[in-house]
């Protein structure tokens, strides 16, 4: 029986994790829940799963993971506010099932220096796919990682045609049902850029050996290319419960968590090169990742500010990446300490607001 704490229990990842646990009461026991503002749902979850320990907010989440003994903590918090809880989990003996990619991206060395071998299991579908595929060979046999992207709702459109995109259009993701910021990030492909940085940090593969290909069907979730020319991919119908279940009990699989592909029905899988002119976010993220230090934290914070300004009607769609680029260009770098990262984030948000005000 795995004792589980779920942070972000009322969000998409948390709700689906509870679906997995509900269907497998013989394998998992919920011992703690962490939520944000949705107190009503969190308390209902606590009642259903007989959970005594419930926290609200990131600070309380840190205290929760330090005081409640668990085998695995699923961090499904959205945004860089999840960094503190991530670091708190790494102080314990629990496995960290990480869906909060931002905490790894902005924390960088802060996280890597604290994590024990095998303690961190990725929950993002792409990185879960890579982790599964990497079991087919040794690390020195890996030629490159290939992350797949659906292309978002604006695949195939030119940059000029995106100038008048509305917030409603940006939230129409073709595959996944997610929150406001991450869905917008999927439209701009900032999310894929963040995933490139995450892949580098998780798997210690250089940026020049991490590629992105557009795969509109979202069946192949990512691939590992080996030195002998073979490619190992993980494929399944889109279903976040699969990587969530692996995160909860890695490396073991949970039977029945998802439906398999139907190999008796004709289907077509396509792969396309990424249009970096229309979607420059991935290349910008790679440059930010290579720079290291506090640049990823600045990139992420500036983007969060710009996305919220876009949805508030203060700037246009193309202004999101223009704002992020301007803020990144102004940054002088900084030391990767907790204070340094938090300071860089605060600076990035202030600077982004200045850029946004000039655009408005």
Task: Describe each model-derived feature in a short phrase.
Residues 1-360:
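Catalytic, metal-anchored helix/loop core of enzyme active sites in primary metabolism
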